[in-house]
Amino acid sequence: MIVDERMTAFINSLDTGNTRILDAVEREALDSYVPIIRKEMQSFLKLLLAMNRPKRILEVGTAVGFSSILMAEYAPKDCKIVTIENYEKRIPIARANFVRAGKEKQIALLEGDAADVLKTLNEPFDLIFMDAAKGQYIHFMPDILRLLKTGGTLVSDNVLQDGDIIESHYAVTRRNRTIYKRM
């Protein structure tokens, strides 16, 4: 983590916790080694949602639907969320989680490669949350910027890769070098 531990502790101290369904989905994801957003990002998203009150949210990278459900829980009730996922094994899990959370009408999951799906979208979004293959973000950016409403908010999770991105190429562990190069 590149954020000072005291800052992380402070951010976490402000968080009021999650709903039962979010706690359950988080626990199941972590037990299955499915990456989901960290507590700090959860708190940050809740703050952004409270401040900006978006009506339309785009998420790139659904996984098991944790972030989508979190945003649906804390965004205005009339907010619509569109989320994109390419990994076939996670799509049915995400859909089931949306139903469990009672958010299946608020969240639309689009299946496919984000680079292709983004090109098919036309309506602007108030908030775009990117949490997919970090090395692909540069390829998504023209469509992301086209879809982001003027004055909208773009959030990209983990773009600093725990600080690796600011390190020398040689200081980055071998398994992280491909992501490092692409970013």
Model-derived features: positions:
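A short alpha-helical cap/connector motif
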Residues: M1-F129, K134-V155, V159-M183
